């Protein structure tokens, strides 16, 4: 039903994935190198927060990483809090997995074994997980 409402309204959504991090510069470097993202925006001391937005031109999503100087928020992701990227081209997937390791991500076993069948799960310094899945997303027409 929800998808019918979006179609009816012709809604074009842009997704921002906002996460607190313990080291803003380190998170920026890891995600830029690992996922080939670029800085698309940044701010300093915005009511006590510093932040950076990472993305790519033409994409319908971006990451926002923040750090509060006055009351740092500790990240508390679970093993099932995932960002999943579908990479159906095998060469692109292998290259991307290697790039994640070079950027400082650690490869871990997925909590849900489904993600290990055709993918690899990586964790960043704050415990956030990214899955690179060597498949097409089955629900996208």
Indicate residue ranges for each PLM-predicted region.
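Short acidic/polar alpha-helix capping motifs at helix-coil junctions
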Residues: 3-5, 15-18, 35, 60-63, ...
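Short, charged/polar, Gly/Pro-enriched secondary-structure boundary elements
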Residues: 58-63, 126-130
């Amino acid at each position: 039903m929800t998808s019918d409402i979006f179609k009816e309204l012709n809604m074009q959504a842009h997704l921002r994935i906002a996460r607190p991090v313990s080291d803003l510069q380190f998170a920026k470097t890891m995600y830029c190198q690992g996922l080939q993202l670029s800085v698309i925006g940044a701010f300093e001391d915005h009511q006590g927060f510093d932040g950076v937005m990472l993305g790519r031109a033409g994409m319908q999503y971006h990451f926002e990483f923040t750090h509060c100087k006055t009351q740092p928020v500790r990240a508390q992701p679970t093993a099932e809090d995932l960002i999943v990227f579908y990479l159906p081209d095998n060469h692109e997937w292998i290259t991307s997995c290697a790039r994640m390791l070079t950027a400082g991500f650690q490869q871990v076993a997925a909590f849900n074994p489904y993600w290990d069948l055709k993918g690899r799960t990586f964790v960043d310094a704050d415990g956030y997980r990214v899955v690179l899945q060597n498949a097409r997303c089955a629900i996208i027409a």
